[in-house]
Amino acid sequence: MRPIVLMGHERPLTQVKYNREGDLLFTCSKDISASVWYSNNGERLGTLDGHMGSIWSIDSDHTSLYCVTGSADYTIKVWTLMNGQCVQTWNCPVPVKRVEFSPCGKYILAILDNVMKKPGSIEIYEVKRNPETNEITEFVEEPIHSIVTHEGLDAASVAGWSGEGKYIIAGHKDGKISKYDTQDGYKLVESQQVHKDSVSDLQFSPDRTYFITCSRDSNAHIIDIETFKVLKTYETDSPLNSAAITPLKEFVILGGGQDASEVTTTSASEGKFEARIYHKVFEEEIGRVVGHFGPLNSIAVSPQGTSYTSGGEEGLVRLHHFEKSYFDFKYDVEKAADAKEHISHEA
């Protein structure tokens, strides 16, 4: 895979994300502007300028009309993608570590950090839309709900919405995950310990019925949303910063590497600065993609399953389009199952 290297940031990447159609790619970093790119050729569509601090998180709504960013400058901003204008700013008491639109596009969750004697919380903001055009007509100024860190849990580090926005799933700094029912006053349904270190990323399957978590403890887990049981575990030999589930193929892509603060003059191979592709079902590593010369901070796979993007500590974004060998790869047991199915169809 020959990557397209996107040079739009001067500082470490914090998040990369595709829109629902997969034609746009959003990137944000520790510098003060976010970028929007065409995912097919890596051409930059534009930048989102207006924050005064590092941008920790970015997300596009289901219509690709708006996107939201959360920043270390204590603000959440909503932007129109037609012209890159900021149309709403919510001020917060602490830095904002994660933002995400709900699947319906009417709510935004934001993780507020646990600093300056604040316990950390997940705030839910509401936006009102014109049902015909999907344009936002009103931004509700105050959060409609605040999930303050529960006793027995550390502050949330990552969070997202399950299918149809039924639950909010959060990963915490103590390695626990938790589930909140949005239809029952955002009550805590259950929580459990899955990692030994802070949960560094949480991404959902295409149908949002299960999700993958990863951590600096070098492990990633796939967890079912309804049962909250760990279905699969992927063990690596380096700390993980990001994990994504691929559509079309039964794979997961993991990324991380030696902590940036510990990197001195080690070679890229020693630092483990590569994306690892694991078989989702068999839990075995099947390939690696090298290229970054610092830890991988964020990985995203296009919803169509045709490309993936990684953002690194060195400020580079690498956009990879999968080749034929990726789609053709199968274990012997998968080939046998396909052959059996083919024979039964012919019969």
Curated annotation (Swiss-Prot):
Subcellular location: Cytoplasm
UniProt-listed Pfam families: EIF3I (PF24805)
UniProt repeat feature WD, residue ranges: 8-49, 51-89, 149-190, 194-233, 291-330
Residue ranges the record marks as coiled coil: none
Domain of life of the source: Eukaryota
GO BP term, example: formation of cytoplasmic translation initiation complex
PROSITE patterns, per database record: WD_REPEATS_2, WD_REPEATS_REGION
Gene Ontology terms: cellular component: eukaryotic 43S preinitiation complex; eukaryotic 48S preinitiation complex; eukaryotic translation initiation factor 3 complex, eIF3m; multi-eIF complex
The family this protein is said to belong to: Belongs to the eIF-3 subunit I family.
UniProt protein name: Eukaryotic translation initiation factor 3 subunit I
Organism: Candida glabrata (strain ATCC 2001 / BCRC 20586 / JCM 3761 / NBRC 0622 / NRRL Y-65 / CBS 138)
